[in-house]
Amino acid sequence: IPGSQGSLDVLTERDIKFVEFAAHNDIDYLGLSFVREASDVVKLRELLHSHGNTTARIISKIEKPQAVNNIDAIIEVSDGIMVARGDLGIEISNEKVPIVQKTIIRKANTKRKVVIVATQMLDSMIENPIPTRAETSDVANAILDGTDAIMLSGETAAGAYPVEAVAMMKKIADNVEESPFMRKNKFPRKMIEEEKDSQAMAIGMSIADMARKMNVKAVIALTGSGFTASMLAEGKLNIPIFACCPSKNICRDIKLYRGVFPYIVDFDASIDKESLKQMDEFLMKSMKLEDGDLVLVTGSVPELLVGGTNFIKIHEIGKLKRQENAQK
């Protein structure tokens, strides 16, 4: 019933069995439906931990008015947020959904949490090969709001044009990201205010400034926990963030962040000469960068510390090797 508080447990017996299966099968993300308060998320995390899984991430689906009222606390304990507009529109009325969507995206961005906008994005493409103009604008505005991901549901699950729907969504996203209206190389103001004394935030803002002013092709984030890459993602950089991670779990964790392309690396994540030469080979082979390209390298030294981002290096790919060859 729309607007009702409801007293049912957020996890049914069937859900608990699914969670047990997920915990033992290396699942990256679980979506928790009909979250009402932070304790619902905590309960799911404790259940995962009871099965020995401490790596699966939780996406809280915001579908109830109670969740909207408790959004700050829910964001704090979640790994990501999904604005599930279908049920949310029934619960709080359609005209309120756009402002709620913008508010949630902004709050999630500020806290460096993945945010997904979903439901009825290209709904008419369930039956038609092209979307309505209103749907196109809806997808575009979600991207302009700052969402990390846009999601199809019925369009691909049961629609007559699933491939066309995905292609259309990508076409809209590409067009929006090239537009002058897209926030680029700029962190959310509230995030800057809340982290004004953060060393990592200062480095992130410097990288955003360099990305805007210099002809750099990418940021190389040497990250042990995913922190550096997730922080940079909120700056909406106009260049890709190639995250070099020590494990597949970290890579998979951060893949949902906007503009982040994670890779498992087998070289030392440091900035000594030999490591940089290894990195150059990797960048040209795996990331399609070229000899002579400028990139920004960031991370923490002397070792990969969680949240310890403490350096930026302007690096020219191939320069070290060329210098060595010239000295022979």
Q: What residue spans do the PLM features occupy?
A:
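Non-catalytic helical/linker scaffolds that mediate oligomerization, partner binding
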Residues: 1-328
